Structure formats: structure tokens, C-alpha cells
Curated annotation (Swiss-Prot):
The chain crosses the membrane at residues 264-284. This is V-set and transmembrane domain-containing protein 2B. Its main location: membrane. Residues 1-28 form the signal peptide.
Amino acid sequence: MEQRNRLGALGYLLPLLLHSLLLFVADATFTEVPKDVTVREGDDIEMPCAFRASGATSYSLEIQWWYLKEPPRELLHELALSVPGARSKVTNKDATKISTVRVQGNDISHRLRLSAVRLQDEGVYECRVSDYSDDDTQEHKAQALLRVLSRFAPPNMQAAEAVSHIQSSGPRRHGASSAVSSNNAGAAVRTTSETSHDDKNPPPGSPPAGSGVPEAAAAAASATHTATTTAAAAAASSSASPPSGQAVLLRQRHGSGTGPGYSADPLLSLLLLALHKFLHPLLGH
């Protein structure tokens, strides 16, 4: 009976001894390492890091998070091709310590949390674990690359869009002014044509072209008619001069004033007709 109990006790002790031996022989290693991540500006991220010391004895362990300035492009490419957690090539002298955690035991873990990341946060982050189990302190490292994408378009792109918008809106304004100028030119042409057409029409009561009156009588009648018309126009303008706006309209309607002007007043037309009928027989005799 006692022999059976001893065998049973040995059966329980053997697995425990084997487990303890495995823990003692096992090397210190990372159980969780940070991974490369790409985020947008303003996002929140977490980088895990966990380490287990060799053996079951309680040791003093320390874990630190470091931020390394952005390495050269060729080193970034090399880091992207390497295995995360096994990097030890980035040793930037401008490294900045972020946090430190120290425990007494054989396991340690610490998560790095970054909130509202910025473009300047891009770079390599390193998890350093110091193992004080032996006389000589052992240091283990695991690195991860953080890439931050811009949430908005670059400023030079916005400036280029603004310049292109200004350049595209310029011809439209020029085209509108050209249209207005062409309309004004068309109106001026129409006014000139109307004026020339009005100048060609003979005044009321004037003798038709090709009549049998001699050339001398016709010239005298024309001179007398011109003088009478000028005197009547001067008297009408001195008695009641129209406003400047109406004068401009009259000039636009009857021409620039270089040729003989004819008034549209019916009384003046009747007066001119009477003078013409009175002077025509006298000049004929």
C-alpha cells in the first residue's frame, strides 16, 4: 500500500519537474512584438510589447519605449523587408524615451498608446527590455515602423488649384467685356447708318431732283434755305434749349452735327415751307 502511494506521488512530481526544467532551459524571448502600421493623421494606435525571461526565478525586468527619428529611405526599405521584432539596426542618436515600466518577475508587458497622431510622429518605435537576471544586464529590442498619411491635400496642391481657377476665370471676364464692346460697336454702326440714311432724305417741301430750275437759281435757293434754317434753329435753341440728356439723344438720332440739321418741330416745318413757296416764284422770275 505504501509502495503504491510512493509511485503515485512520483507520478505527480515527474510532470512538475519536467515543466520546471523546460522553464529553466528556455531562453528569454518576446511573446508579443509591435508590428508596422500605417494610419491617417488624427487616428489613435496601440503598439504591444511583451517579454518573458528565462527560468521561473523572479527577476528584475524593465521595459522602455523609444521613438527614433525618421531613418534614411534606404533603411526604411530595409526595415520594411525585415522581420518585425528582430530589428536592431536603427540606432539613432536623437532617440527619445517615451515611457518606462519595471516589474519584479519573469514576465513583463507594456502597450504604447498614441492618440491623434501627427505627421511628425512618423518613424521607428522601439521596445527595449532590460533583463537583470545575470550579473551582466541583457538588453532585448523589438522595432516597428509607423507611417502617417496626410488627411488633407498638400498646401501647394490647393495653391495650384486656386491659380488654375483664376486663370480659367480670366478669359470669361474678358469675353464678357468683349461682348459689351461689340454690342456698343454694333449700336454705333446702327446709329451711324441711321444718321446717314436720315441725311439722304430731303426735307419736307424741297424741290425734287432733276427739276427745270436753272443751276444758278437752285444754288441761290439752297443758300437762302440754309441761312433761313440756321437762323430758325438758333432762335429755337436760344428760346428753349433742351436738357443735356435730350441733346445727346438728338445728336445720336440726327448725327454728329457736321451736316445741315433739320428740326422735327411741325411749326418750324410749316414756316420753312411757306418761305420756300414765297421765295421760289421770285427767284424763278
